[in-house]
Regions:
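C-terminal "exit" segments of structured domains
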Residues: 288-340
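Acidic, polar low-complexity linker/tail segments
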Residues: 20-28, 72-132, 139-146
Length: 340
Protein backbone atom coordinates (compact mmCIF):
# COMPACT_ATOMS: atom_id res chain seq x y z
CA UNK A 1 0.00 0.00 0.00
CA UNK A 2 2.86 2.36 0.81
CA UNK A 3 4.32 1.95 -2.67
CA UNK A 4 1.07 2.82 -4.39
CA UNK A 5 0.59 5.89 -2.21
CA UNK A 6 4.07 7.02 -3.19
CA UNK A 7 3.36 6.34 -6.85
CA UNK A 8 0.13 8.32 -6.70
CA UNK A 9 1.86 11.19 -4.93
CA UNK A 10 4.64 11.24 -7.51
CA UNK A 11 2.12 11.18 -10.34
CA UNK A 12 0.32 14.14 -8.75
CA UNK A 13 3.55 16.09 -8.46
CA UNK A 14 4.39 15.38 -12.07
CA UNK A 15 0.98 16.53 -13.26
CA UNK A 16 1.38 19.79 -11.36
CA UNK A 17 4.94 20.54 -12.43
CA UNK A 18 5.05 19.34 -16.02
CA UNK A 19 3.59 20.25 -19.35
CA UNK A 20 2.01 17.36 -21.24
CA UNK A 21 4.02 14.22 -20.67
CA UNK A 22 6.98 15.70 -18.82
CA UNK A 23 9.37 18.48 -18.01
CA UNK A 24 10.62 20.87 -20.65
CA UNK A 25 14.32 21.66 -20.94
CA UNK A 26 14.49 25.51 -20.87
CA UNK A 27 17.56 25.35 -23.11
CA UNK A 28 15.68 23.29 -25.69
CA UNK A 29 11.90 23.89 -25.69
CA UNK A 30 11.44 21.01 -28.14
CA UNK A 31 12.87 18.58 -25.59
CA UNK A 32 10.55 16.89 -23.09
CA UNK A 33 10.64 14.00 -20.67
CA UNK A 34 8.09 11.20 -20.59
CA UNK A 35 7.65 8.39 -18.11
CA UNK A 36 6.98 4.69 -18.44
CA UNK A 37 6.13 2.57 -15.38
CA UNK A 38 6.61 -1.20 -15.46
CA UNK A 39 6.16 -4.20 -13.17
CA UNK A 40 8.87 -6.86 -13.62
CA UNK A 41 9.15 -10.45 -12.43
CA UNK A 42 11.23 -13.52 -13.31
CA UNK A 43 10.06 -16.66 -11.49
CA UNK A 44 12.72 -19.04 -12.80
CA UNK A 45 15.57 -16.69 -13.61
CA UNK A 46 15.16 -17.34 -17.33
CA UNK A 47 11.55 -16.31 -17.97
CA UNK A 48 11.36 -12.52 -17.43
CA UNK A 49 7.99 -10.81 -17.88
CA UNK A 50 6.72 -7.25 -17.66
CA UNK A 51 3.39 -5.48 -17.53
CA UNK A 52 2.71 -1.76 -17.75
CA UNK A 53 1.25 0.72 -15.30
CA UNK A 54 -0.86 2.72 -17.73
CA UNK A 55 -2.24 5.01 -15.02
CA UNK A 56 1.11 6.52 -14.06
CA UNK A 57 2.80 6.30 -17.47
CA UNK A 58 2.75 9.37 -19.71
CA UNK A 59 -0.14 9.17 -22.21
CA UNK A 60 2.24 10.25 -24.97
CA UNK A 61 4.02 6.89 -24.77
CA UNK A 62 2.18 4.79 -27.33
CA UNK A 63 2.33 1.10 -26.42
CA UNK A 64 -0.30 -1.59 -26.18
CA UNK A 65 -0.57 -1.33 -22.38
CA UNK A 66 -2.80 -4.40 -22.21
CA UNK A 67 0.02 -6.73 -23.22
CA UNK A 68 2.31 -8.79 -21.03
CA UNK A 69 5.73 -8.93 -22.66
CA UNK A 70 7.79 -12.08 -22.10
CA UNK A 71 11.57 -12.07 -22.49
CA UNK A 72 14.40 -14.52 -22.98
CA UNK A 73 17.56 -15.60 -21.21
CA UNK A 74 20.82 -14.42 -22.79
CA UNK A 75 24.09 -16.18 -21.82
CA UNK A 76 25.93 -15.97 -19.60
CA UNK A 77 23.69 -14.29 -17.02
CA UNK A 78 21.36 -11.80 -18.69
CA UNK A 79 17.72 -11.53 -19.68
CA UNK A 80 16.20 -9.34 -22.38
CA UNK A 81 12.60 -8.20 -22.68
CA UNK A 82 11.80 -6.50 -25.99
CA UNK A 83 8.95 -3.98 -26.10
CA UNK A 84 8.23 -3.45 -29.77
CA UNK A 85 6.53 -0.72 -31.77
CA UNK A 86 6.90 2.18 -29.32
CA UNK A 87 6.12 5.73 -30.37
CA UNK A 88 6.04 9.05 -28.50
CA UNK A 89 3.15 11.18 -29.79
CA UNK A 90 1.46 14.04 -27.93
CA UNK A 91 -2.14 15.24 -28.05
CA UNK A 92 -1.31 17.55 -30.97
CA UNK A 93 0.09 14.62 -33.00
CA UNK A 94 3.63 15.91 -32.51
CA UNK A 95 6.09 13.02 -32.69
CA UNK A 96 9.23 12.77 -30.55
CA UNK A 97 12.49 11.05 -31.32
CA UNK A 98 14.04 9.28 -28.33
CA UNK A 99 17.34 10.81 -27.18
CA UNK A 100 17.91 8.74 -24.05
CA UNK A 101 16.28 6.60 -21.36
CA UNK A 102 17.16 6.62 -17.64
CA UNK A 103 16.10 3.64 -15.53
CA UNK A 104 14.93 3.74 -11.89
CA UNK A 105 13.82 1.03 -9.47
CA UNK A 106 11.66 1.52 -6.39
CA UNK A 107 13.72 0.64 -3.32
CA UNK A 108 11.66 -0.18 -0.27
CA UNK A 109 14.56 0.34 2.13
CA UNK A 110 15.06 3.87 0.75
CA UNK A 111 11.36 4.60 0.40
CA UNK A 112 12.27 6.20 -2.91
CA UNK A 113 13.30 5.63 -6.52
CA UNK A 114 16.96 4.80 -7.17
CA UNK A 115 18.65 5.31 -10.51
CA UNK A 116 19.79 2.00 -11.97
CA UNK A 117 22.98 1.94 -14.06
CA UNK A 118 23.30 -1.86 -14.31
CA UNK A 119 19.80 -2.80 -15.43
CA UNK A 120 19.06 -0.60 -18.43
CA UNK A 121 16.46 0.13 -21.10
CA UNK A 122 18.07 0.30 -24.53
CA UNK A 123 16.34 1.59 -27.66
CA UNK A 124 16.74 1.24 -31.42
CA UNK A 125 14.78 2.90 -34.21
CA UNK A 126 12.99 0.32 -36.35
CA UNK A 127 14.26 0.18 -39.93
CA UNK A 128 12.11 -2.73 -41.12
CA UNK A 129 8.76 -1.00 -41.66
CA UNK A 130 5.74 -1.93 -43.77
CA UNK A 131 2.92 0.57 -44.40
CA UNK A 132 -0.36 0.17 -46.25
CA UNK A 133 -2.19 3.37 -47.19
CA UNK A 134 -5.97 2.98 -47.57
CA UNK A 135 -7.12 5.99 -49.59
CA UNK A 136 -10.64 7.21 -50.29
CA UNK A 137 -11.12 8.36 -53.89
CA UNK A 138 -14.88 8.90 -53.79
CA UNK A 139 -16.53 11.67 -55.77
CA UNK A 140 -17.54 13.50 -52.59
CA UNK A 141 -13.96 14.78 -52.29
CA UNK A 142 -14.55 17.03 -55.28
CA UNK A 143 -11.63 19.33 -56.09
CA UNK A 144 -9.89 18.35 -52.85
CA UNK A 145 -9.02 14.99 -54.41
CA UNK A 146 -6.00 16.45 -56.21
CA UNK A 147 -4.70 17.78 -52.89
CA UNK A 148 -5.24 14.37 -51.30
CA UNK A 149 -3.07 12.81 -54.00
CA UNK A 150 -0.42 15.47 -53.41
CA UNK A 151 -0.42 14.87 -49.65
CA UNK A 152 -0.28 11.09 -50.10
CA UNK A 153 2.71 11.47 -52.41
CA UNK A 154 4.46 13.72 -49.89
CA UNK A 155 3.75 11.15 -47.18
CA UNK A 156 5.53 8.49 -49.25
CA UNK A 157 8.49 10.80 -49.86
CA UNK A 158 8.81 11.63 -46.16
CA UNK A 159 8.60 8.03 -44.92
CA UNK A 160 11.16 6.79 -47.45
CA UNK A 161 13.47 9.69 -46.60
CA UNK A 162 13.41 8.56 -42.95
CA UNK A 163 13.54 4.80 -43.69
CA UNK A 164 14.75 4.13 -47.27
CA UNK A 165 13.99 0.41 -47.02
CA UNK A 166 10.42 0.87 -45.79
CA UNK A 167 7.83 -0.83 -47.96
CA UNK A 168 4.65 1.06 -48.76
CA UNK A 169 1.55 -0.35 -50.44
CA UNK A 170 -1.73 1.28 -51.45
CA UNK A 171 -5.40 0.33 -51.34
CA UNK A 172 -7.65 2.86 -53.09
CA UNK A 173 -11.41 2.73 -53.09
CA UNK A 174 -14.70 4.24 -54.16
CA UNK A 175 -17.28 1.81 -55.60
CA UNK A 176 -14.39 -0.42 -56.70
CA UNK A 177 -11.30 -1.45 -54.73
CA UNK A 178 -7.84 -1.47 -56.27
CA UNK A 179 -4.41 -2.05 -54.78
CA UNK A 180 -0.72 -1.54 -55.48
CA UNK A 181 1.78 -3.98 -53.90
CA UNK A 182 4.16 -2.77 -51.22
CA UNK A 183 7.51 -1.49 -52.43
CA UNK A 184 10.17 1.09 -51.61
CA UNK A 185 10.17 2.32 -55.22
CA UNK A 186 9.13 5.93 -54.64
CA UNK A 187 8.63 6.75 -58.31
CA UNK A 188 6.35 3.76 -58.87
CA UNK A 189 4.24 4.62 -55.82
CA UNK A 190 3.88 8.28 -56.75
CA UNK A 191 3.04 7.41 -60.36
CA UNK A 192 0.33 5.06 -59.13
CA UNK A 193 -1.19 7.76 -56.93
CA UNK A 194 -1.09 10.22 -59.83
CA UNK A 195 -3.18 7.76 -61.87
CA UNK A 196 -6.01 7.51 -59.33
CA UNK A 197 -9.46 8.66 -60.44
CA UNK A 198 -12.63 9.33 -58.49
CA UNK A 199 -15.74 7.18 -58.39
CA UNK A 200 -19.08 6.90 -56.58
CA UNK A 201 -19.71 5.38 -53.13
CA UNK A 202 -17.43 4.50 -50.22
CA UNK A 203 -16.30 0.89 -49.76
CA UNK A 204 -14.35 1.69 -46.62
CA UNK A 205 -14.51 -1.43 -44.44
CA UNK A 206 -13.77 -3.88 -47.23
CA UNK A 207 -10.78 -1.77 -48.23
CA UNK A 208 -9.43 -1.67 -44.69
CA UNK A 209 -9.84 -5.44 -44.55
CA UNK A 210 -7.73 -5.79 -47.71
CA UNK A 211 -5.08 -3.54 -46.17
CA UNK A 212 -4.93 -5.81 -43.12
CA UNK A 213 -4.61 -8.85 -45.41
CA UNK A 214 -1.67 -7.24 -47.19
CA UNK A 215 0.11 -6.42 -43.92
CA UNK A 216 -0.44 -9.89 -42.48
CA UNK A 217 1.27 -11.39 -45.53
CA UNK A 218 4.36 -9.21 -45.00
CA UNK A 219 7.39 -9.79 -42.78
CA UNK A 220 8.41 -6.64 -40.90
CA UNK A 221 9.39 -5.44 -37.43
CA UNK A 222 6.66 -2.78 -37.55
CA UNK A 223 3.41 -2.78 -39.52
CA UNK A 224 1.22 0.29 -39.99
CA UNK A 225 -2.17 0.88 -41.57
CA UNK A 226 -2.98 4.47 -42.59
CA UNK A 227 -6.65 5.03 -43.42
CA UNK A 228 -8.00 8.19 -45.05
CA UNK A 229 -11.66 8.91 -45.83
CA UNK A 230 -14.11 11.79 -46.02
CA UNK A 231 -17.25 9.73 -45.52
CA UNK A 232 -18.92 6.69 -44.00
CA UNK A 233 -19.04 3.23 -45.49
CA UNK A 234 -22.00 2.69 -47.82
CA UNK A 235 -20.82 -0.04 -50.18
CA UNK A 236 -19.08 -2.89 -48.31
CA UNK A 237 -20.51 -6.39 -48.07
CA UNK A 238 -22.50 -6.85 -44.82
CA UNK A 239 -19.88 -9.14 -43.28
CA UNK A 240 -17.39 -6.25 -43.14
CA UNK A 241 -18.51 -4.27 -40.10
CA UNK A 242 -16.59 -1.99 -37.71
CA UNK A 243 -16.64 -4.80 -35.12
CA UNK A 244 -15.15 -7.22 -37.64
CA UNK A 245 -12.38 -4.77 -38.58
CA UNK A 246 -11.53 -3.97 -34.95
CA UNK A 247 -11.36 -7.67 -34.12
CA UNK A 248 -8.92 -8.22 -36.98
CA UNK A 249 -6.72 -5.33 -35.88
CA UNK A 250 -6.60 -6.56 -32.29
CA UNK A 251 -6.20 -10.26 -33.14
CA UNK A 252 -3.88 -10.30 -36.12
CA UNK A 253 -2.54 -13.65 -37.28
CA UNK A 254 1.00 -12.30 -37.59
CA UNK A 255 3.52 -12.02 -34.75
CA UNK A 256 3.65 -8.23 -35.12
CA UNK A 257 0.58 -6.21 -34.20
CA UNK A 258 -0.71 -3.71 -36.75
CA UNK A 259 -0.67 -0.10 -35.58
CA UNK A 260 -3.38 1.88 -37.32
CA UNK A 261 -3.68 5.61 -37.95
CA UNK A 262 -6.94 7.09 -39.22
CA UNK A 263 -7.82 10.41 -40.85
CA UNK A 264 -11.38 11.64 -41.35
CA UNK A 265 -11.74 14.81 -43.44
CA UNK A 266 -14.65 16.71 -41.93
CA UNK A 267 -15.30 19.08 -44.81
CA UNK A 268 -18.34 17.17 -46.04
CA UNK A 269 -19.55 16.40 -42.52
CA UNK A 270 -19.98 12.70 -43.17
CA UNK A 271 -17.18 10.95 -41.30
CA UNK A 272 -17.98 8.45 -38.58
CA UNK A 273 -15.77 9.76 -35.78
CA UNK A 274 -16.43 7.01 -33.22
CA UNK A 275 -15.57 4.26 -35.72
CA UNK A 276 -12.40 5.96 -36.98
CA UNK A 277 -11.31 6.70 -33.42
CA UNK A 278 -11.72 3.06 -32.41
CA UNK A 279 -9.98 1.97 -35.58
CA UNK A 280 -6.82 3.86 -34.53
CA UNK A 281 -5.56 0.81 -32.66
CA UNK A 282 -2.41 -0.54 -31.01
CA UNK A 283 -0.68 2.77 -30.35
CA UNK A 284 -1.98 4.65 -33.39
CA UNK A 285 -3.65 8.06 -33.62
CA UNK A 286 -6.67 9.61 -35.27
CA UNK A 287 -7.25 13.11 -36.66
CA UNK A 288 -10.23 14.99 -38.07
CA UNK A 289 -8.99 17.94 -40.15
CA UNK A 290 -11.70 20.42 -41.07
CA UNK A 291 -10.39 21.31 -44.52
CA UNK A 292 -7.81 20.33 -47.12
CA UNK A 293 -5.14 22.66 -45.72
CA UNK A 294 -5.39 21.06 -42.27
CA UNK A 295 -5.34 17.66 -43.98
CA UNK A 296 -1.91 18.38 -45.42
CA UNK A 297 -0.54 19.06 -41.93
CA UNK A 298 -2.00 15.79 -40.63
CA UNK A 299 -0.40 13.75 -43.41
CA UNK A 300 2.93 15.45 -42.62
CA UNK A 301 2.71 14.75 -38.88
CA UNK A 302 1.59 11.18 -39.41
CA UNK A 303 4.47 10.52 -41.81
CA UNK A 304 6.88 11.38 -39.00
CA UNK A 305 4.96 9.45 -36.35
CA UNK A 306 4.72 6.34 -38.51
CA UNK A 307 8.39 6.33 -39.54
CA UNK A 308 9.74 7.18 -36.09
CA UNK A 309 9.10 3.93 -34.19
CA UNK A 310 11.31 2.16 -31.66
CA UNK A 311 11.98 -1.19 -30.09
CA UNK A 312 12.91 -0.98 -26.42
CA UNK A 313 14.98 -3.71 -24.75
CA UNK A 314 15.07 -4.06 -20.97
CA UNK A 315 18.34 -5.75 -19.93
CA UNK A 316 18.65 -7.35 -16.50
CA UNK A 317 20.40 -10.30 -14.85
CA UNK A 318 18.88 -13.74 -14.21
CA UNK A 319 18.09 -13.22 -10.55
CA UNK A 320 14.80 -14.85 -9.56
CA UNK A 321 12.05 -12.31 -8.86
CA UNK A 322 8.77 -13.93 -7.71
CA UNK A 323 5.52 -12.62 -9.12
CA UNK A 324 4.39 -11.99 -5.54
CA UNK A 325 7.19 -9.43 -5.18
CA UNK A 326 7.29 -7.72 -8.57
CA UNK A 327 9.88 -5.00 -9.07
CA UNK A 328 8.49 -1.51 -9.64
CA UNK A 329 10.42 0.17 -12.47
CA UNK A 330 10.30 3.71 -13.82
CA UNK A 331 11.89 4.89 -17.05
CA UNK A 332 12.36 8.55 -17.90
CA UNK A 333 12.44 8.96 -21.67
CA UNK A 334 14.00 12.13 -23.03
CA UNK A 335 12.65 13.09 -26.44
CA UNK A 336 12.86 15.88 -28.99
CA UNK A 337 9.89 17.02 -31.07
CA UNK A 338 10.33 16.26 -34.75
CA UNK A 339 7.35 17.78 -36.50
CA UNK A 340 5.72 20.54 -34.44
Amino acid sequence: MKIFKQLSFLALLLSLTSCGGGGVDPKNPKSKEFELYIDYWNTQGTNPQITFDAVNSSPEVKIDFSQTFAGIAVPPNYTNVIIDNVRIIDANDVNYQIDGITAYEWREELDNWKEDVEFTMNYTQVQDLSVIMVLDESASLGEDFEKVKQYASSFITNVLAEIPNARIGIVDFADQIHSFPATNNKAALINYIASLTQGPFTTLYESVNLGIDMLEDMDAEAKVLLVFTDGTDNNSDPEFTPTYILDRLNNTTSDVKITSFTIGLEGKGGVDKPVLTEMAANGGSTAFPKNADELGKVFLKFSSSIANVYNLTYVRNQQVVPDSDKRKLRFVIKGTAKND
